């Protein structure tokens, strides 16, 4: 089938995350100004890709799916239990949520309800421990459950609105 399609023998199959990582490495090699890597959930859910981007010295804001497992970072709990980001979001107290407006839309200001917490991606047994990250969660008031989740390695002190704006920036590309 490959020969019939006239695909050169030198071309090998690569996953989308592998291709993305090659593109990021090429940008670094070409001295493209460093910025935060933005990923949708098809890329962001891949822990290997996130780890590789961190290894290249780049920060990211990566959309993930609700079943991704994390451990909540707490000072008094050295080994918190693994929990899905969806379950963690539903367990947060009311005061953890803030309504944030991130930009003007075509008809109105874009706003929703968000929470952010410090987590570590919960590694698969035997995998090296992940660094602390920010979990950003969106739960619009008119929804029965949280709708969007991101893991971010940006500066922990980044203003909340700025973090939301960065997460939502991917939609403008």
Predicted regions and their residues:
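An anionic, glycine-rich sequence signature occurring as long contiguous blocks
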Residues: 1-13, 61-172
